[in-house]
């Protein structure tokens, strides 16, 4: 198995674009968000240029409701001319792919009154010729391309076929959870129905078994993952949490600035730009990465990819290059949220979780 970490769009996209353009048999692309800006147009151009006879695109219905990190149905968004122009460009991009003979499907409709909005298909995948697959956190939009993020490039036929089968099940409207074990690498897909059980089987035991240290970088870390990290710290494990200084989700920002919620953890704020990277390093031996944000919604409702990597060379690369850059670009949290703000954030997130479970089941 050949594994490679690609940090940020500047490393990921040139490699993925070259693979797409060289494809001979098929290209499968799955994303939460595809927008009609330079990033989305670059993907569309590469797909149209590919000689592969089979080219398919899966987009979550998120893109029908949120563009450029803006909720499209708010009064301000409805009156925003440039935003509406980007919405039209996004629709034109999708229509252009269809006209080029590239089937496009939207997954996970949000339903009446957007009641199913928490249940997104959050997976990101580029797969070429049952030979190469990319998975991780990067969506196809300019603002996502500007964020700190990470993709895992996997060059292995069995891994590619496994991820292709998962893609095609979802494309046909029949997603299901699945797993593949390879030397130094486990791949797991989550279907949004059995997530809690699978996280408890696959990820939580790694956190619970940590002996010395855990480093986690995540934009939207919440319970139950946060609570397990606090328990690890109570056992004497050194736990470092990297999260964005300027977070586009206010409740999470206030939760992670709350000393009660993060007791025993070293919280560091990544400066200068959003970090959308999601990874956990346990005892400098096991690396967990993929699309999951380690939050309420990934735990219960969202389609996700999870890779558990024990390949020593890749783990060293993550620690020396990716983690080191995150630590160097961050500062310790020095101004905690007030007790009432932290308590309100915790209560609000609990309420959102319970309401979502009531509506969606679970």
What are these regions (language model features)?
Residues 1-362:
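Charged, low-complexity intrinsically disordered terminal segments
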